[in-house]
Amino acid sequence: MDKWKRTLDTPEGSLGYVVEAGQWIRITDYSGTDIELRIPEEIDGLPVRVLTKKTFLSRKHLHKVILPDTLEEIGDWAFTYCTNLESVWIPKKEMKLGNRIFMECPNIHRIYTYEPGVARDDFGRKQHGNRTSEKQQESRKSEEDQWAALLAAATLMLDAEYLVNFTEAGSVEWIRKWDARMNGVLDMDDSEGYTRMILCGEEDYGTNIDEFIKNKRKSKVRLALLRLMNSIGLSAENEVKLKDYLISHTKGCASEESWEVLLKEYGHEQEYFQLFADIGGINEQNFDAILTDMSAEYAEMKAFLIRYKAEKMESTDFFDSLSLDSL
């Protein structure tokens, strides 16, 4: 008798829901312009247990969502086409998961899991007691951020729904499975899938074989950068493999996808340039050409590279004719 749709106001919109059997809540849909959204644990005194199919379909304003620890099911395509969604907090528990719940969410960078019953702040973070030092909190945060990034990449980069496991995420075994899938992607021939794409009329990588291969390499570069930036549990063997891949496609190589991705997609992020320089992607041989590629838009990063070369690279002859004022 309670099965009619009701609404709950949010700061900038509303959640649609129904009461099931007079005992629990099913969220049916959302409309509005909230950037950050916390789904309540209870509505009308009843636990929120289910996000139905397509609950947040194509909600472009959403950037962050925190799901309640009462949740037991997330339906098919629940967040599909949420193109600006960046992070989600999900309870670390067994639950029924539908198909492709984060399909076509190109900007989802982190999927966090949290222990049910642990107090959270407004952004989903754990609230630590006073006895926990700032250093310990930062260490926890760093590890949590790393495997949250890997969990998001399982769906975004690896197309591995079996890795979207909220109870195992971050465990040694889960990371082993993640890296096994990563290696499968990296080892795949760059031309694999081209014929199928043409026959099926898909255009994700372009219709020219050279363009297809180039974009395949770029996707591998993104994957390698992400794993090195989130290196929790990374074996020495895999670390070498990732670095070698990036170096083999840097500026001055037969193909330069590593440098192209770094400049165009991470051109204002110093930590990525630091990583790329540290592994040898930026070196004495290609330094001049790299600076030439960097327009005035990247003046800050050019200055960083000049300082880096002065401090870390052996030869300083190059700087006899350079100054920061010339940027």
Label each PLM-derived region with a short phrase.
Residues 275-281, 286, 291-327:
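Charge-dense, extended regions
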Residues 2, 8-25, 31-49, 60-73, ...:
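Structural signature of tandem-repeat unit edges
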Residues 226-249, 272:
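Repeat-mediated protein-protein interaction surfaces in helical alpha-solenoids
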Residues 98-102, 273, 302:
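Short amphipathic alpha-helical segments and helix-helix/interface helices
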Residues 95-100, 118-124, 314-324:
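Short, surface-exposed, charge-dense and proline/glycine-enriched linear segments
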